[in-house]
């Protein structure tokens, strides 16, 4: 009996072995007895409308859970990992080999769908693999940013999952061989004790910050609207104090008057400078990335030989 095991037997055993550690009966749970276990106002919730439900990343902002203990998004492992199970002729995400290393049904197609919603089609297989990892990081960041910015209402977010037990396309941020995906690098930033967040909706931008340290932190944020040539079209500096273990919405503004008809050629930028000198920059476009009129990069490199 599930309830007997998890709500009577295991709590007693746990308490006998460890008097200090808090016991939670299940996940998701609203406290026990399978009483509306995914209640947004009690306990912890699992959320999969983004990914399984094919909802856009913006849907995270419609949900204010008390604690989101499971949500996720898939990507492919890096090419070195793929090469351990696939020959060059198998390097198509719909090949039998690639689909056999995917245990979530038609998920390779789902990754491609989300890429099409956010980016232009990658030029080759390696680019597609890379973009899938960037997309995974953006997806998880969207949820974490929203829930951290609403600290107090939501007190935690755990993404699914950390790692893999075989080389595969999955929700993991570290692959089977211990190689970090883009998500794991990004998580180090968006889960930082002091972090800034920005999101856009239409021509509106919302700027927030979170402070998980035990001390109040003074913060200066410079908000800019730039065009793709990096010209500054708008600039405003906001100074505030973010209390210990709290979050704050610092600025919400409609930039229609600044953007005008240049929506595809501008973006919002927020530069955060904390009292200890720590800085970070967040940026977001006002249209899907695939619709941005970005400049072609001019990259120059030089090699210098040294003894």
Could you tell me what each predicted segment is?
Residues 7-10:
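Short alpha-helix
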Residues 261-277:
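Short, aromatic- and glycine-rich surface loops/edge beta-strands on solvent-exposed regions
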Residues 280-307:
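Edge strands and adjacent loops of beta-rich recognition modules
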Residues 1:
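Active-site groove signature of glycoside hydrolases
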Residues 12-15, 25-27, 31-37, 42-217:
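Substrate-binding clefts and catalytic carboxylate motifs of secreted carbohydrate-active enzymes
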Residues 209-211, 225, 272:
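Hydrophobic beta-strand positions in extracellular immunoglobulin-like domains
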Residues 231-232, 276-281:
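Short, exposed coil/turn segments at beta-strand boundaries within extracellular/luminal domains
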Residues 221-264:
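Intrinsically disordered, low-complexity Pro/Gly/Ser/Thr-rich segments with frequent PxxP/GP/PP motifs
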